[in-house]
Curated annotation (Swiss-Prot):
Protein's name according to its UniProt entry: Pantothenate synthetase
Major location category of this protein: cytoplasm
The keyword Transcription belongs to this UniProt entry's keyword annotation: no
Keywords attached to this entry: ATP-binding, Cytoplasm, Ligase, Nucleotide-binding, Pantothenate biosynthesis
A GO MF term: ATP binding
The protein's role, per its UniProt record: Catalyzes the condensation of pantoate with beta-alanine in an ATP-dependent reaction via a pantoyl-adenylate intermediate.
Gene that this sequence comes from: panC
GO-annotated biological processes: pantothenate biosynthetic process
Subunit structure: Homodimer.
Record-level GO cellular component terms: cytosol
Other remarks on this protein: The reaction proceeds by a bi uni uni bi ping pong mechanism.
EC code(s) of this entry: 6.3.2.1
Chain positions recorded as beta-alanine binding sites: 61
Positions with a binding annotation for (R)-pantoate: 61, 155
Amino acid sequence: MRQVTERNAMRELSRAWRARGERIGLVPTMGNLHRGHLELVERLARRVDRLVVSIFVNPLQFGPGEDYDAYPRTLEADLNALEGRGVDAVFAPNAREMYPGVEPPWTGVDVPALTQTLCGAARPGHFAGVAVVVIKLLNIVEPDVAAFGRKDYQQLQVIRRVVGDLDLSVEIVEVPIVREADGLALSSRNGYMDGEQRRRAPALYATLCEVAAALEAGRRDWSQLEAQACRRLEAAGFDAAEYVAVRRCDDLAEPQGDEPRLVCLGAARLGAARLIDNVEARLKR
């Protein structure tokens, strides 16, 4: 496993693999790796000849007052975690390498139908920054397939839309959420919580499961379900329930009539930790 820090070196390595007819996979991360990231790595390693994991804390997707400076940088531990897992290269550039010689505002990518609601409303500009860095990574590594986790469900749909709309030649693979035994979705930000906050945190998943169960049992009063769920989160000790929302799976639009599948999404804060999660509901026709 080699570590690459320069864009041109990563391009040359990928193109050498491609010239030999090898299939390339990419797992984009911001580091501080946990079992959820390693699941992405292991799933993709079985499908490709060469696997690249990128580790880059992308400044473009952090807004003013967010945790860019505080976000954990654990490169040595991450490299150790990736050893022996079928990873051929770790692409770990710094911000100057990824965004050389330019000052903001950078070129943006706008997906208005998917980015102005839910987490996009709470974090203006976040998904534009995600889209830019993902496109850059895809252009640098030139993978045949890239893996993203379902936990960041809105991000996953934004990336799928960008790849489709811009005719990018890459397959996007969705990997299921990895959870703790009590249901909490694994996240690099879970470490922000103290012991009491960590004990409260599984209520987000439990609440979304209740919403999904109500939908599967026949309830269709979306707004009332969402409001009840937010009240439950606040009663469970969350500092703020940013949203609980029932949406169509593909475009995150509000449901219209009968839908075979819906996704229940939520975001809530416990101290410095902003937790997100989602649960799918399969509806009876």
